[in-house]
Amino acid sequence: MPPTIEVPVLVVGGSLVGMSSAMLLGHYGVRSMVVEHHRGTAIHPRAAQITQRTMEIFRTVGVEQIVQRKSSEQFVQDGAIMGVETLAGKEVAYYIANLNEGIRDLSSCERVFISQSLLEPLLKQRAEELGAELRFATEMISFEQDGAGITAQIRHRDSGDTATVRARYMIAADGAHSRVRERLGIRMLGHGAFSNSITI
């Protein structure tokens, strides 16, 4: 049986929240392991608007400028968000006429548009530079919590190889339908989805 892998923090989920967590931990000298069931970073645009507070955090960990550069390859920096009936149809409303209107009075960082498929690789690279161990195509299949931390079983989706991970802390970054949160009995409250949208 392979030896137990010991790491201060196990991050379950390697999308925007998981990668950002790993970057911040690494920035402050804390090692982490990220397990993500997908085989790589996002391949679809998905989320696109990054707030100025997030950009302030990205500045702290050294990725603000590269995120801005990558964003400017795709989007107008002070662009708008609008609603339409169809791609060629009637304009319904402008939700935001200028993404950064008033923002420069509040922060030295700006909001940006950048598709998730472009952002995740940037966060992945920085997390690795700061010492995170990233395991894609890997899922957490179970965990037990005690007074000193957690013991988790992880499995590679392709090979079927399993390993035991012992961590002082675990971050549940596995999305809106989090299995970790469900296992811990943490419920989501609220009205649920307000709308559906597609980033193009």
Where are the regions a protein language model picked out?
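Core beta-strand elements of the Rossmann-like FAD/NAD(P) dinucleotide-binding domain
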Residues: I5-V7, S159-Y169
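Flavin (primarily FAD) binding-site architecture
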Residues: A172-I186
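N-terminal Rossmann-like FAD-binding beta1-loop-alpha1 element of flavoenzymes
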Residues: T4-V34
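Active-site-adjacent segment of FAD-dependent monooxygenases/related oxidoreductases
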Residues: I43-A47, T51-E128, E144
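Central beta-strand plus flanking loop segment that forms part of the substrate or channel wall
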Residues: Q65, Q116-L118, L184-I200
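Conserved phosphate-binding and hydrolysis motifs of nucleotide-dependent enzymes
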Residues: G13-G18, R168, D174-G175
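A conserved short coil-to-beta-strand element within the FAD-binding core of flavoproteins
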Residues: F136-T151
